Amino acid sequence: IGRNVMQGGSRRSALYGSMDAGHGDIWELLHAKNWSDIPIEGTELSIADAKKFNFNYHAPLDMMNISLNYGDEWLNGGQDDIFMENCKQALMTGEPGFSFNFGDKKNETLRNACTEITSEDDSDVCNLGSVNLANIETPEDFKDVVHLASKFLVCGLIRAHLPYEKVEKIRQQNSRIGLGLMGMHEWLLKRSYKYEMNRDLMRWLN
């Protein structure tokens, strides 16, 4: 569904998949995106070659962010061979990524693709949005915008049509929203600041 349904008619869903580092299939996932090692039958090309000619050429786990989940076992000195191979793969292909979940958060392995939200509940949902700081003139306006945007996200979460009953139950239980901040560089440029923290920005954010 995520590969084909367009959000708002213009944006494809972001996909995320992860696996525990101790899973029996972990070595297969580690190398799943080595497309240069996967030949196309009847040709001398690999899938990576085909992707260079046609970005939309189908490839395993294409359009999905993948990660390995590391927990207390890794933290206590185990799974070093897997971790080092993960580092090697990430340097070669950019994936898999790394997900670290320790102690009382060890089961929070579920994420949305950009990982603003973490959860341990199957079928969890979240409603995300961003405030463009560059379009706001005063700290008072910023406060009002954050307040209204948070309300908007809550209302959207409540009103959203959900695919099945379990999602609705988890939504009522957790009610997750995430309000991000963008446009900070433009905000700084408009005020002739360098791209760094300053007292004015600190005052706005506090």
Regions found by a protein language model. Give the residues of each.
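Function-dense linear segments that define catalytic or interfacial modules
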Residues: I1, V5, Q89-R176, L181-R191
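Conserved, charged catalytic cores of large soluble enzymes
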Residues: N4-N107, L181-N206
